[in-house]
């Protein structure tokens, strides 16, 4: 079986990587800071849609800087012990002659499931914290709430979809190397269907070339189909808000694998950002509320009603703006926001969990229940903590999150103290008061 072209013609060096100049610059600065022994971040997260070259970029970096690449796939190493074992292998395995050091690549971290892969995220964070070598993580969608601890621990570097002309240069080079006749119109068609995915475009080019011996527009139309891919939340929002036709808006909703209730949260958060006119905002929210109603009914009555949910979430919101009826209408660019509702849930859960463990630690030290510690001893502990912070940090083995909770509670007590110590001064009243005794 012939070697797949996307592997055969994969870039070997950073200079050969097309269209990612900003990402390459950031990556080079990061690896050089590591080689100097002063990295600002021990790990980077390369993120972007499938086929943009995340793994390729990591491999090219290792080759340029003569680093031995130690690759792990997060979707294969799914728990605490697996990742720890592979990390230990990376740290003790000797390097090949002539190699300066190692580069650890952890692929597809967004393939981890917070529940099914319990401990995996913690293991990766532990690996980052203790590593002696630079670490690169990759993800298609890094915005999953379960990956938030990772996002906070790494440098984020975005890789963008390949635009038409860089992708066309890649395909032309392959045609020349394989001595295949390729029509420009055929390459344009393949690029359009690939939606910026270089791997998909190269695979389609190879399929046509090996099937016919050359590549013409008619041949490409016979074999190449639009790439079937999942839309991320930002693409889904753009698909809805920027749609000019009914089918475009509906496809934006049906082509994404995001949970429908979660997508509603995204739409809810971003409708006011996209639409300026208050009547447009009202119509959009009216459509969204009806979509929510039909989604609930579909669960109770029958899934046939789900089509109405799609119609209202997509076209209903897309055409809430009457401005779209104007021939000159152009959707404004908006930096879409992650749903605050989900962020707040995540924050409050983190605080609750940290407070719970803090109360348990204090309770164990003073032999009291969690409830009694909260109600009777916590205020005294806060005062004591201000004076003996280092000692208590060590004795109770407090985590950073638990320390943050103490600071939060301490600021609350300090605020209360100010109110008590600095009351509003009032002139004493000169009016005589008389007490009355109630007759029995």
Curated annotation (Swiss-Prot):
Gene3D superfamilies tied to this protein: 1.10.8.60, P-loop containing nucleotide triphosphate hydrolases
Keyword Nucleotide-binding applies: yes
Provenance organism: Sulfurisphaera tokodaii (strain DSM 16993 / JCM 10545 / NBRC 100140 / 7) (Sulfolobus tokodaii)
InterPro entries: AAA+_ATPase, ATPase_AAA_core, P-loop_NTPase, Rep_factor-C_lsu, RFC_lid
UniProt key word Nucleotide-binding: yes
The protein's name: Replication factor C large subunit
Quaternary structure and interacting proteins, as annotated: Heteromultimer composed of small subunits (RfcS) and large subunits (RfcL).
Function, as annotated: Part of the RFC clamp loader complex which loads the PCNA sliding clamp onto DNA.
CDD domains in UniProt: AAA, HLD_clamp_RFC
Biological process, per Gene Ontology: DNA replication
SMART domains the UniProt entry points to: AAA
Keywords: ATP-binding, DNA replication, Nucleotide-binding
HAMAP family tied to this protein: RfcL
Family: Belongs to the activator 1 small subunits family. RfcL subfamily.
Chain positions recorded as ATP binding sites: 48-55
